[in-house]
Amino acid sequence: VPNYSEVLPKEASLETRLTKRIRLKIPLVSAAMDTVTEAETAISLAREGGIGIIHKNMSIEEQARQVMKVKKSETKIIENPVTIAPDATLREAKDVMARHNISGLPVVIGDRKLVGIVTDRDLRFETDLEKPVREVMTKEVVTGRALTTYDEAVAILRKHKIEKLPIVDENGRLVALLTFKDIQKEFNYPSAAKDERGRLLVGAAVGVGKGAIERASALVEASVDVLVVDTAHGNSKAVLDTVRAVKEKFKDCQVIAGNVATGDGAKALIEAGADGIKVGVGPGSICTTRVVTGVGVPQITALLDCCKVARQWDCPVCADGGIKYSGDIVKALACGAETVMVGNLLAGTDEAPGEVVFYQGRTYKVYRGMGSIQAMRAGSKDRYFQDEAASDKLVPEGVEGRVPYKGPLSKVVFQLMGGVRSGMGYLGARTIKELPEKARFVRITPAGLKESHVHDVQITEEPPNYNVP
């Protein structure tokens, strides 16, 4: 219901909490689904101010590599940069650059003593790739000292018109590297969600049971910011035991657990040590849990119940599922959630890992539930507590389908957050924290829902933030 307001949409702040310790610039989390979130989605969403949760339908090593890819995509100062020896060949240098997706390498000897730098420009016109790096590297290198501040380092880059500044200690040993590319990213993405070292935030999913701790250990080693104990039924012994075990072993790591749909479930997860809880049993567009099992709670009811309990422990809630329009995000936040997790809305973007398909002249991307037969066979059986079941004995709780292609993720996020800001303006809420205080819900009938949508007109041009239900 609209309120008296003195808040313009552009004045609304979207900053919020993901967990007790992690803050985001926007309340958007991408789902840990194998057709939604891998490194590319996580990088793009973190640059917009949200966070991506890398799915676990892959090996432990690959998931850790995906996390590292996000963490290394940008940083204020690169600590322990990748290096090469002067006797290495140009072929080896090119291979290292390609493997790490970088454009230059400091050249070091012995105990990381800096003797030069080689970049892709040095290699561009070289035809003899067996030539040693020492023959083409730049030997007179401009450097910064270990005590050089970030602003001083940026000034050195500008003064000497260089793109890379190695940072060395008093003995000339390489300790860090600053690049113009990372500085440029900071200007291009001022609202990016980053850790204290200037790296993008990223989360990763873990399951329950035997492999959970091993997977969590590898992810923590890869510098993951938050672990998500990701199951369909969070209020169960296996999940609660896993949360306790993860928190006990990795005390400094933030843990989100779910999914639950009742206050009792939320309380159990919080008491087990969760730093954030995920709410939603069956509201997702590709989820069939409520129909197959007969169990679930309508999402608004579940959120109101769980948020009431979570508020007593000051534990953030993430509303997972049921988000079709930006207005649904506003409703979830008005219930007391501090973030929303979306899958369908991002599955059609360029960055999503789903396969591109063409159907009847239109472009789509594959989108499947983690409870679909195909996803369960690929590794998500334990999410539905069927990890011991044979592939031909699985009981699915989701479907595989397709969603319209949507282009870059940034455009989708812009429209979603624009809708949220407008909703906050209607309610007179300057911050997300104020939304539950300002919001008042009314129950509508099917006739009211029909009236809410476009009616009595044929759409001739589709807007970027609305599609006919």
Language model features by range: what are they?
Residues 47-62, 224-236, 275-293, 323-357:
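Glycine-rich phosphate-binding active-site loops on the catalytic face of alpha/beta enzymes
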Residues 23-30, 77-81, 196-205, 246-261, ...:
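Short beta-strand/loop segments at the ligand-binding rim of alpha/beta enzyme cores
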Residues 54-57, 83, 104-106, 143-145, ...:
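Catalytic beta/alpha-barrel core
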Residues 56-70, 107, 111-126, 167-184, ...:
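Terminal amphipathic helices with adjacent charged low-complexity linkers/tails
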Residues 8-10, 59-68, 126, 130, ...:
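Active-site-adjacent beta->alpha loops and helix N-cap segments on the catalytic face
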Residues 8, 12-24, 31-33, 62-100, ...:
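Bateman/CBS regulatory modules and CBS-like beta-alpha motifs in cytosolic regions of diverse proteins
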Residues 1-5, 84-85, 144-145, 155, ...:
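Alpha/beta catalytic cores of nucleotide-metabolism and tRNA/nucleoside-modifying enzymes
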Residues 40-42, 214-222, 261-279, 319, ...:
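Catalytic cores of alpha/beta
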